[in-house]
């Protein structure tokens, strides 16, 4: 069985601004319990105990999506006994999306990309993700990855 959606983070290796905001409630509740490193060894131990044999890391809102993807790619290459792929972040509304996609394609563990288009009404209004589905640039970005 494959764990098709999990996150890893090393707060010393990659910057996750949303994760480190102290005292801020998120759409999923209080982030305090997860404001710590969650690394591959812990994930493997927990996932294997549940019968998982492989996993897919999903991007988790790093300040620099490419930096996160490179970090995950390194984790994958250093842990050959645990098959893992990743879905990385790409800003599909950006004029630089083709460059981002080219860089991501150089990473052997990347099997897809995502850009979150909805979390909660308040967070979406603040981050403008609520406008993505009506954005011509975003729609062009979606089209570019389907070609």
Segments and roles (model prediction):
Residues 1-147:
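Helix-coil boundary/capping segments in enzymes
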């Amino acid at each position: 069985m494959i764990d098709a959606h999990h996150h890893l983070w090393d707060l010393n290796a990659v910057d996750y601004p949303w994760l480190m905001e102290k005292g801020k409630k998120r759409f999923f509740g209080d982030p305090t319990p997860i404001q710590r490193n969650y690394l591959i060894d812990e994930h493997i131990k927990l996932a294997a105990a549940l019968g998982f044999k492989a996993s897919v890391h999903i991007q988790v809102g790093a300040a620099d999506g490419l930096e996160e993807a490179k970090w995950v790619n390194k984790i994958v290459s250093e842990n050959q006994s645990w098959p893992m792929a990743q879905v990385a972040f790409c800003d599909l509304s950006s004029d630089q999306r083709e460059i981002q996609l080219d860089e991501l394609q150089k990473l052997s563990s990347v099997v897809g990309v995502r850009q979150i288009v909805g979390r909660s009404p308040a967070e979406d209004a603040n981050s403008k993700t609520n406008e993505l589905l009506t954005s011509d640039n975003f729609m062009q970005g979606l089209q570019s990855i389907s070609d």
